[in-house]
Amino acid sequence: MTRSVWLKADDAVGDWEARKRRITAGLEAGVDWVLVDERDVSRVRELGQVNVAAFAGDDVHVMDAEEQPDAEPDAVIVGKEGEGDGTVDLPSDFSGSADLTTLRRAEAPAGAYVRILDQDYESFAETAAVDADYTIVIGDDWQIIPLENLIARIGDETDLIAGVQTAEEAETAFETLELGADAVLLDTDNPDEIRATVEARDATERETLDLQRATVTEIEETGSADRVCVDTASMLEHDEGMLVGSMSRGLFFVHAETADSPYVASRPFRVNAGAVHAYVRTPDGGTKYLAELSSGDEVQVVDTDGNTREAIVGRAKIEKRPMFRIEAELENGDRIETLLQNAETIKVATDEGRRSVTELEAGDELLIYYEDVARHFGEAVEESIIEK
């Protein structure tokens, strides 16, 4: 499931300048959607590239794209100043609902906006979800139980979006009933909360890897090869690096160049990852050859505890350098290997801490990631492949 963050920026926020500040903070943080009133759609388009949803006015007909394409929202949301938010009383029979009728007649992708004031509004949200592409539910005195009920009952019929005001509430919404909400609608002016909510979204998509130890059985100089430095567009932490190796089933943890050295300045955005043939792990759980990497690609950054995040490649620098071949054995007897540059600045994670490859000896234990699968074009396949 891909989560998303919506940012509420309608007239309830304030005048256009107040709304603009909120939207700008959202764009800078990386929100996925902005929810505004219809009249602000083109204004949002001018501020940056983002999905724009608009509350429906009296007429939900979307303007002809040839007349004013920037004014057409990506989704129309029904329920503000109607039955959904309690402005108009709910009908006893939902078949007579004006909001639901409007929702069904909408020409664009459409969503429902419902404040959960009591169980009747829960039922109304469930009914709306049958026809809605998006179902936004707001709890004024928010409780987990209504959200759990809706997650359990609605299923995959719609994208369920929970209204929140803080990043902490967003984390809870994303984790409720393990499945969690598909998205959150954030209502805050605080740039820190907006950034933290986006980070909470990203965290739900990230995997935690089960790293293990392998014992060095052999290390030897091999001569020169084409080596790849992966220069990311992110500053990496001292305990972070990448997973690389000659064999897709077993990847070695190689530290980023965050440590000071008497020989060269630190490069905390860089991982000296190995030879061009080697695999590097990507955020989707796949692999790429180091030789394939280019500016704009995504690679997976991992720390020594197995926590992961994404980084954009700014540059892949290939140069001919002297190399070591490192072989290590796992507890199951399988042996894996890789080529790393023969230089003091390239460090791996051992059982005794960070160590330069020039100081490695047989018997040292290295941090690695192992999965007993074969790969074809970077994707795991159920096939017998011999790598040696």
Curated annotation (Swiss-Prot):
Disulfide bonds: none annotated. It catalyses: 2-amino-2,3,7-trideoxy-D-lyxo-hept-6-ulosonate + NAD(+) + H2O = 3-dehydroquinate + NH4(+) + NADH + H(+). InterPro entries: DHQ_synth. One of its GO terms (molecular function) is 3-dehydroquinate synthase activity. Coiled coil: none annotated. It comes from the Archaea. Keywords: Amino-acid biosynthesis, Aromatic amino acid biosynthesis, NAD, Oxidoreductase. One of its GO terms (biological process) is aromatic amino acid family biosynthetic process. Its EC number is 1.4.1.24. Pfam families: DHQS. The keyword Cell inner membrane does not apply. Belongs to the archaeal-type DHQ synthase family. PANTHER family: 3-DEHYDROQUINATE SYNTHASE, PTHR33563. Catalyzes the oxidative deamination and cyclization of 2-amino-3,7-dideoxy-D-threo-hept-6-ulosonic acid (ADH) to yield 3-dehydroquinate (DHQ), which is fed into the canonical shikimic pathway of aromatic amino acid biosynthesis. This is 3-dehydroquinate synthase. It comes from Natronomonas pharaonis (strain ATCC 35678 / DSM 2160 / CIP 103997 / JCM 8858 / NBRC 14720 / NCIMB 2260 / Gabara) (Halobacterium pharaonis). The gene is aroB'.
